[in-house]
Regions:
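Short, mixed-charge low-complexity intrinsically disordered segments
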Residues: 402-435
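Glycine/alanine-rich phosphate-binding loops at beta-alpha junctions
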Residues: 33-37, 388, 405-409
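A short, charged, amphipathic alpha-helix used as a generic interaction element across diverse proteins
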Residues: 385-402
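Classical nucleotidyltransferase
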Residues: 94-97, 110-123, 127-178, 184-200, ...
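A short, exposed loop/beta-hairpin motif centered on an aromatic-Gly-Thr core
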Residues: 376-387
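Short, structured motif recognition centered on aromatic/hydrophobic residues
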Residues: 365-370, 397, 426, 430
Length: 437
């Protein structure tokens, strides 16, 4: 059987045209990663999420076009990835409700964004939930639905988003426990060394500091902004330090290794700041100019972007629709004729079955176990490297029973003869139940 590709999912909140720091730190490496063999990539415009903070329809509409055009102009290939708009997948909102109904309020109370809003209100002497809408509170459930609708294995996130991936895992595990193994437990993929660029004033390039260089700034504006980069007072002919130089750091992000070495030597030889800025402009514009032309074309022809997003939505829904159909059946939203045929399969009968539990321990490893209806441990795995490995092992045991138990022996704690017999009996029960559905 061919190995299933690792599925990655990346959400992009529509927030306007990116700047050079966004491009070098996140967009360029993310697009390069889509060319990795053995990976299946999903990129989506998180316009539902944008509604939590923005109630300006014109801005939502404009920013969605700008960010979609930006990613496409920078090289995101819709033939190699599934690129879609969140609001074009109605199954996401249906799944959000299914997940809402198995998510404890206490879990959502602990979400960092919600707690931060409450802490801010407390410091200001306001009601704890002042200004907090239900969208912010339910954000983790919608994010879980974004991930689970495609059973993504890995979700690239910053450290501030790790908790949301862990919450998605908890929600998926709760649903699996109640209704059977429908979801892969996702894993956060944290980039430890994200490149950050210095802005015009030497601080980290950020819209909040008003020190950014827009990614697709016209050549004249780009040259003017580069000319305003803060430098020290060292005169031409006076050696200059590359360390701490915002100009040099920007140059490094766009130049070849040979060019970087030459610029470092030029610093040591006392290059004039004006000449250094001319070199920086030429270096950046060389990479950005072709992308700028594509961006301007896409912005002038939004129908091209819309067609790409609709094609992506069609690809995405080819996976989402059958999954939600299975989930509707699993939770009991079926045709009445189906219900009549299945009256003997009550919830109590389902809960009387053995079940698999999948979880992560503090050692970072992933584990699964088989327990009977009373919670007695029948089978315990050893630590596995990924949730995907655990999910595959569970699927093998559910489908192949005794054969899988023998094949997976190196991944399972040793069993006595009596324990093996109990485990085999439990697996047979699960197979019989699955065959009768």
């Amino acid at each position: 059987m061919s190995e299933q590709p690792t599925r990655f999912l990346t959400g992009i909140t529509p927030s306007g045209t990116p700047h050079l720091g966004n491009y070098a730190g996140m967009m360029r490496p993310a697009i390069a990663a889509t060319r990795t063999a053995g990976c299946e990539n999903f990129y989506f415009l998180a316009d539902y999420h944008a509604l939590i903070k923005t109630q300006d329809p014109a801005r939502i509409h404009r920013c969605t076009l700008e960010i979609a055009a930006s990613w496409l102009a920078c090289g995101l290939d819709p033939e190699k990835v599934t690129f879609y708009r969140q609001s074009d997948i109605p199954e996401i909102t249906e799944l959000t409700w299914f997940l809402t109904c198995v998510t404890g309020k206490g879990l959502l109370n602990r979400a960092h964004a919600y707690k931060a809003a409450q802490d801010k209100n407390q410091e200001a002497g306001r009601d704890l939930d002042d200004g907090v809408n239900a969208g912010l509170f339910m954000y983790p459930v919608l994010m879980a639905a974004d991930i689970l609708i495609f059973n993504a294995h890995k979700v690239p996130v910053g450290r501030d988003q790790i908790q949301h991936i862990e919450m998605a895992r908890d929600i998926a595990a709760s649903f699996n426990h109640l209704y059977g193994e429908h979801f892969t437990l996702p894993e956060a993929l944290v980039e430890e060394q994200v490149a950050t660029l210095a802005g015009l004033d030497g601080r980290k390039m950020s819209k909040s500091y008003d020190n950014t260089i827009p990614l697709f700034a016209p050549p004249a504006q780009l040259k003017k902004l580069i000319g305003s980069i803060v430098t020290d007072s060292r005169a031409p002919g006076e050696a200059k330090a590359v360390e701490g130089s915002a100009l040099f750091q920007l140059y490094q992000a766009f130049a070849t290794p040979e060019e970087v070495a030459a610029m470092a030597q030029a610093y040591a030889d006392g290059i004039a700041w004006g000449e250094a800025k001319e070199r920086l402009f030429a270096c950046i514009d060389r990479e950005i100019a072709p992308m700028r032309a594509r961006y301007e074309d896409l912005m002038a022809h939004p129908e091209k972007v819309e067609a790409i997003l609709q094609a992506g939505a069609e690809k995405a829904r080819a996976l989402a629709v059958p999954l939600v159909q299975r989930l509707r059946h699993a939770v009991g939203l079926r045709r009445l004729t189906e219900q009549a045929v299945s009256t003997d399969k009550s919830k109590s009968a389902k809960l009387a079955l053995p079940s698999f539990k999948q979880y992560r321990e503090k050692d970072g490893k992933f584990y699964f176990k088989l327990v009977d209806a009373q919670g007695k441990l029948l089978l315990q795995s050893l630590g596995l490297d990924s949730p995907r490995d655990a999910g595959h092992a569970i699927a093998q045991l559910q489908q192949q029973g005794a054969a899988a138990l023998a094949a997976l022996a190196p991944q399972i704690e040793a069993l006595s003869d009596a324990a093996r017999a109990e485990a085999l009996q439990a697996l047979a029960q699960l197979q019989a139940y699955a065959a009768s559905e």
